[in-house]
UniProtKB/Swiss-Prot annotation:
It is an enzyme of class 3 (hydrolase). It catalyses: GTP + H2O = GDP + phosphate + H(+). It comes from Cupriavidus taiwanensis (strain DSM 17343 / BCRC 17206 / CCUG 44338 / CIP 107171 / LMG 19424 / R1) (Ralstonia taiwanensis (strain LMG 19424)). The keyword Oxidoreductase does not apply. Keywords: Cell inner membrane, Cell membrane, GTP-binding, Hydrolase, Membrane, Nucleotide-binding, Protein biosynthesis. It is found in: Cell inner membrane. This is Elongation factor 4. The lineage of its organism: Bacteria, Pseudomonadati, Pseudomonadota, Betaproteobacteria, Burkholderiales. One of its GO terms (biological process) is positive regulation of translation.
Amino acid sequence: MDHIRNFSIIAHIDHGKSTLADRIIQLCGGLSDREMEAQVLDSMDIEKERGITIKAQTAALSYKARDGQVYNLNLIDTPGHVDFSYEVSRSLSACEGALLVVDASQGVEAQTVANCYTAIELGVEVVPVLNKIDLPQADPDNAIQEIEDVIGIDAQDATPCSAKTGQGVQDVIEALIAKVPPPKGDADAPLQALIIDSWFDNYVGVVMLVRVVNGTLRTKDKVLLMATGSQHLVEQVGVFTPKSIQRDALTAGQVGFVIAGIKELKAAKVGDTITTVQRKAEAPLPGFKEVKPQVFAGLYPVEANQYEALRESLEKLRLNDASLMFEPEVSQALGFGFRCGFLGLLHMEIVQERLEREFDMDLITTAPTVVYQVEMRDGTTVTVENPAKMPDPGKIEAILEPIVTVNLYMPQEYVGSVITLCTQKRGTQVNMSYHGKQVQLTYEIPMAEIVMDFFDRLKSVSRGYASMDYEFKEYRPSDVVKVDILINSDKVDALSVIVHRSNSQYRGREVAAKMREIIPRQMYDVAIQAAIGSNIIARENVKALRKNVLAKCYGGDISRKKKLLEKQKAGKKRMKQVGTVEIPQEAFLAILQVDDK
């Protein structure tokens, strides 16, 4: 066991995490040159295209060190994005060490810091590495200074390397072996294995990626999953050297996969503990928690007959993504669809993109909303994740909205514009500190303001230099109201939004004005109103198209003209009673683009 090293790689998006993983795998001969491809651990197309890692992957490699010993290195690839922070913490708790990869030309960024703190809290040994030193604009000394300032770990002996050219990668592995402790654990104790990740395979069912902490996991063992209490028979165990290789057993300290004929991903939850039925472990490994969705949106098929197909696609996606939640919902405006819950905005975009790309769905998405807690007058508390389900304002005692702590990093010349943005979004400043040329700002901002367009606005006010990450803090009472949009005095449920009262007038006017541009003219007047409860706060009219009924009266008597105009008016009135206004597709997207002032 002294020769095992379990480690993962922490880095901000595009700092070269996957490329470094490729080089390490190549050096250790995990794959032949023919099988080697760029970003070998990112198996989804969408991961390669966006350059992000979504699911955790592993590689068990053997490396002959300079001291002549052969070491088993288990590389556990982690996602880097905040939406997947729970998956990151599970991957990290399966390791004893982590390589902190920092781009020498860019310095420390927000998500690196967030994941690095997670690692330090879990007691993982962090080994700093400076990547991209082959770039002409690389500034290693500045990067070392930033690591020490911002993260607060000693980085004087940070290993410089270039994952692209392969220079210095061997030094990185040597530093890793020297600094990272071997795993602790007792191979004869009752089995405890941590599920790092799980995914669905069409042939064998659910494949679980596990790190054995104590005990030994053999094929034909009967195992118990402690969080769900379900029992299964192990069919095969093995390791990935990115390719899967079967073994007879996994012992303490090793990382590998387990296949036990599980049909549903819900049974194998990330962070759960596996133990054997014969010799049960006393307690599960710490740190397991159910993942709760933070952002909700409605997904509707464009064609009503695609509803079943959408349900199937969502079911298939859920096989590989246990944190996706959905339930059927009906909207008068959009017909049948689903209310889906996501971990965050990136997660939502990825799910939408995969539905469109892998399953050929055409979707309409309603504006993303967060979960509000509503305290009623009768003392009960309701959670509301869909604006259309908000109870009657007369019965509400208080509404609590989720507040998140946002950490922002940016060069100091952009501080002013970022602070202005945060203030617009009802943020309160908690902290501000300077690290060399970088500034770290900490704000508490209502989550509802972040899901709309905060990230895009942040990138545009800072020209792409600011980076951020956020985590949920608490629910706080807030003066928010539901703004309904009425078209010819009919509520359109899919257009309702929940906004802060101070912003509601403006928001109502903007949406009404936007609708007026989008809704085509009908044969009768269309009134577009924005209302809070029964108070109308804004109104726009779409004028009717009308025929010139007086064209045939040449000169003519005034009473004759009046008669024709009255007749036209009566006809329009009748049409208005029976006519319904078709709301075009763009109207639902337009809601997303209404900027706050």
